[in-house]
Amino acid sequence: MLITTEGFILKNRKFGETDSILTIFTRKAGKITAIAKGARRPKSNLLAGIQPFCYSEFVLYKGKNMYTVSQCEAKEIFYPLREDLKRLSYASYLVELVEAVTTEGQTNHRLFNLFGKTLFLLKKSDIEINPIVRAFEIKLMNYLGYKPQLMSCVNCDSKETTAWKFSATEGGLLCSSCYSADLFAMKISNTAVKLAIFLLMKDITEVQKLKISDHLNEELKKILKQYILTHTNKYDFKSLEVAEKL
Ligand SMILES: [Zn+2]
């Protein structure tokens, strides 16, 4: 069976003399593994479209265990990401995160669109990286089915509290009367709650110029990291740490 779909290259590994094994996040088939035969021959017409991050149009043959790339045409190679180590590292973080949280063969159109928009944003020079990355993380959780409850207490629905905490296991805010519902809940400031709501509601292209303090970014980053870890249990955040040191 042949399918035609757009997709992003998440991973590209050498295989044998001239082949490549690809992990592709496709629009129509979700995350898939595909072999690109002869792709590493200098004159291969697959070569351009299968580099990491590449957004390409693929014609894929679905075999028993794996797809085979029969044609591919690069639509966007994200060149600016490749020449700037900082952007490259953040893009690698997003790629790893998507790879870790998606299931082979399961489509997720909202995540696919978000991933594409975010890579296109990271290509631009006049952007604020931190709000973009935080927005990506919180939207990713939403699209995986873990939309955090940020308007009221997740335990008693109260909108009033002396101070909020965020419970990763309960998936939202806890008011001061409900702290005992999760002993590992983390303090969260009112400003961070407002920022999280903003990032969740707005399209990611609308947060590209948003200025947030390092302090606020750190606060939300810690909470989202805990939230992602609790529900995906697969990701170690090493590439994010590398990106932040640059
Ligand atoms: Zn409560």
Swiss-Prot record:
Gene Ontology BP annotations: DNA recombination; double-strand break repair
Gene3D superfamilies the UniProt entry points to: Nucleic acid-binding proteins (2.40.50.140), Recombination protein O, C-terminal domain (1.20.1440.120)
Record keywords: DNA damage, DNA recombination, DNA repair
Cellular compartments per GO CC: bacterial nucleoid
Domain of life of the native organism: Bacteria
NCBIfam families, sorted: reco
PANTHER family, per the entry: DNA REPAIR PROTEIN RECO
Function field: Involved in DNA repair and RecF pathway recombination.
Family, per entry: Belongs to the RecO family.
Name by which UniProt lists this protein: DNA repair protein RecO
